[in-house]
């Protein structure tokens, strides 16, 4: 029997546990060996026709499912029938493995639990009793616990949730193969999220992330963390009507703040690996609104990453907010310097003036200019297109001691790599034993892969010198994506089609968040489309809309990509979306529109206009939002095409006029006046007065 002692082991004896959920939690089974054996039903002369154990289980599951789905089904009778038939089958099977591993039986059990969760208020039977029976016969899966945990939380029983979580951990320890390997990995994370919400909703509870880690048995040393995004989504959707939800949200923010303080390295890694600016914006928004003292290193990391994702305006906003909190922070000033080099400007000269203004007014007045500031100035001059000014600065103004400084030297070497077609042979002699700058390290890796004289052994020696295979120092996903491509490149031609890309860098395809991030990074580093297509095939069902958009963009951007394959990918996405039973996500369609706009701009061929029209109309007919970026690209390319074409066809004129009418009603978009003026001067084109 579980008791309060079960939780004292986790140093959280303050938690009160309901007796109802603690019953029947004794260890009830042992690990079984896995060998399918023929069943012998007796020695009578009238033997039944042989039926394999697998077929017996499948037939039983099908019968039970039909019984449950029948219009006049009595759920109590179904459950009793289930117990009787399972016991009978267990007696007939010499080896229960086919029963324990049956997906059909697991699916029926999920249906039974779900049905009972909806009906149980007026019934003597409840989901917990069913789950207990599943555990007794070693049929329980993670998703079965998920259903019951949700049921308990819906019914405002947080203590029962935590008690059931303890039973879940016991069941895992007793039978990990059956419970976890035959379950959805997402179900396990959901169980963690539900238990966390239950912990946050305990009355008179002082939130302590260390106590929660012990309850959940999360090992920070192994990089395990709480699924905060999943928790927030659950509180916004299925648990939005929970009592004391405001208290839960407040407690969650406290928990999140404790995480950013205690697990700051992991949080910094999260920022570093954010694949898109919208993800980074959400992450920053969560951190920015937290109560408590902020970490300047974290703020600086956000600023750096916003620049990498081409959002320098956001960096200026952050600087204006936090420069008052951290007035002497060199890192904030360095980020501002780098940000102004990325702000839009009419010329590189205008960018140079901004850089010098920040350098002279913000950084130079300090008593002691640091090496990081000189390195940032090198980066800023390079990124702004002022490399000639950088060479002059390096030769005439930079103090000699900083020319030998590793950080400054690496910044200059990276600038050379970015502005000149250097080969690996030209760079390797300038490298220190250890490269400190991640961007330079990644650039060197790519130069090595571009050099046919570099062997796999040389590449791996350089790579593992910086990121040992023991995983103590994990690489960024950008770096890992380069390693994944290297693993593919160094395979023999005849073995490449069978090569498992994700497995080669130890990434589980069911880790959707990590897969999404590394997919985008991998696509960006691949010089050809072939390994990208191979990754697409290997991902199979482990894709989301953003992945599809990235793969579609690759077909337009890579030298050997094709329009036909981009269209096929979009068709695959539409089929995938039907199975999700959700509104169609707009990112793949926008990727397709942007791709055709790019083709039209580069080729000047009219054959791409009908494609733009087709998919633009599809978006309208399907109520899919066309992004402002895609709208602006369509407008620009139609205007450019119309200006360069002697005579537009009737169909082209009709589409452009339709597009202009739509533009006139689009309140959320401001067109470029130059594009509007070009179209006004074209024969047959009517520009709505609102746009002029």
UniProtKB/Swiss-Prot annotation:
Gene Ontology biological process: mitochondrial translational initiation; reciprocal meiotic recombination
Subcellular localization, as worded in the UniProt entry: Mitochondrion
Superkingdom per UniProt: Eukaryota
Annotated source species: Saccharomyces cerevisiae (strain ATCC 204508 / S288c)
GO cellular component: mitochondrial matrix; mitochondrion
Recorded GO MF terms: mRNA binding
Range annotated as the organelle transit peptide: 1-30
Record key words, sorted: DNA recombination, Meiosis, Mitochondrion, Transit peptide
Role: May be involved in the control of meiotic sister-chromatid recombination.
Record protein name field: Meiotic sister-chromatid recombination protein 6, mitochondrial
Primary location: mitochondrion
Other observations noted: Present with 7250 molecules/cell in log phase SD medium.
């Amino acid at each position: 029997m579980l008791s309060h002692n079960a939780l004292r082991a986790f140093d959280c004896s303050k938690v009160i546990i309901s007796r109802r959920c603690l019953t029947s939690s004794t260890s009830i089974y042992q690990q079984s060996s896995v060998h399918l054996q023929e069943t012998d039903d007796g020695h009578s002369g009238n033997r039944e026709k042989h039926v394999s154990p697998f077929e017996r289980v499948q037939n039983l599951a099908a019968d039970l499912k039909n019984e449950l789905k029948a219009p006049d089904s009595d759920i109590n009778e179904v459950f009793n029938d289930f117990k009787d038939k399972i016991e009978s089958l267990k007696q007939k099977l010499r080896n229960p493995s086919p029963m324990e591993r049956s997906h059909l039986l697991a699916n029926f059990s999920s249906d039974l639990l779900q049905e009972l969760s909806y009906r149980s208020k007026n019934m003597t039977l409840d989901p917990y009793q069913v789950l207990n029976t599943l555990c007794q016969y070693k049929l329980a899966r993670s998703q079965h616990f998920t259903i019951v945990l949700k049921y308990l939380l819906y019914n405002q029983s947080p203590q029962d949730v935590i008690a059931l979580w303890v039973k879940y951990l016991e069941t895992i320890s007793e039978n990990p193969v059956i419970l976890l390997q035959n379950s959805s990995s997402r179900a396990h994370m959901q169980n963690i999220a539900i238990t966390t919400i239950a912990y946050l909703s305990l009355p008179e509870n002082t939130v302590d992330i260390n106590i929660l880690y012990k309850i959940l048995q999360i090992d920070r040393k192994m990089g395990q963390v709480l699924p905060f995004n999943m928790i927030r989504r659950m509180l916004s959707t299925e648990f939005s009507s929970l009592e004391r939800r405001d208290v839960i949200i407040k407690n969650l923010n406290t928990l999140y703040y404790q995480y950013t303080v205690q697990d700051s390295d992991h949080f910094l890694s999260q920022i570093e690996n954010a694949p898109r600016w919208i993800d980074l914006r959400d992450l920053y928004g969560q951190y920015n609104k937290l109560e408590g003292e902020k970490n300047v290193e974290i703020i600086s990391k956000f600023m750096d990453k916003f620049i990498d994702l081409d959002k320098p305006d956001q960096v200026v906003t952050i600087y204006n907010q936090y420069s008052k909190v951290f007035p002497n922070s060199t890192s904030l000033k360095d980020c501002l310097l780098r940000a102004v080099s990325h702000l839009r400007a009419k010329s590189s000269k205008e960018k140079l003036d901004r850089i010098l203004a920040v350098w002279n007014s913000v950084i130079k007045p300090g008593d002691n200019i640091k090496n990081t500031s000189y390195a940032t100035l090198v980066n800023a001059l390079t990124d702004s297109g002022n490399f000639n000014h950088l060479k002059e600065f390096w030769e005439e103004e930079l103090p000699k001691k900083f020319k030998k400084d590793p950080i400054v030297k690496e910044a200059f070497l990276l600038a050379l790599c970015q502005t000149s077609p250097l080969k690996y042979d030209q760079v390797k002699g300038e490298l220190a034993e250890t490269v400190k700058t991640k961007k330079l390290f990644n650039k060197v890796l790519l130069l090595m892969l571009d050099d046919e004289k570099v062997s796999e052994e040389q590449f791996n020696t350089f790579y593992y010198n910086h990121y040992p295979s023991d995983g103590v120092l994990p690489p960024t996903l950008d770096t890992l994506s380069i390693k994944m491509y290297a693993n593919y490149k160094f395979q023999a031609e005849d073995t490449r089609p069978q090569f498992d890309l994700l497995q080669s860098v130890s990434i589980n395809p069911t880790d959707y968040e990590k897969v999404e991030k590394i997919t985008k990074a991998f696509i960006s580093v691949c010089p050809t489309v072939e390994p990208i297509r191979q990754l697409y095939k290997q991902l199979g069902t482990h894709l989301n809309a953003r992945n599809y958009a990235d793969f579609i963009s690759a077909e337009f951007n890579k030298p050997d990509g094709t329009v036909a394959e981009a269209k096929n990918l979009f068709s695959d996405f539409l089929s995938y979306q039907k199975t999700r039973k959700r509104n169609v996500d707009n990112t793949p369609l926008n990727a397709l529109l942007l791709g055709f706009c790019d083709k039209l701009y580069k080729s000047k061929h009219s054959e791409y206009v009908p494609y733009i029209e087709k998919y633009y109309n599809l978006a309208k007919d399907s109520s899919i939002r066309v992004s402002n970026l895609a709208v602006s690209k369509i407008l620009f390319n139609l205007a450019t095409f119309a200006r360069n074409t002697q005579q537009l066809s009737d169909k082209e004129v009709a589409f452009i006029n339709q597009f202009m009418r739509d533009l006139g009603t689009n309140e959320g978009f401001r067109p470029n006046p130059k594009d509007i003026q070009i179209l006004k001067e074209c024969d047959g084109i009517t520009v709505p007065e609102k746009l002029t």
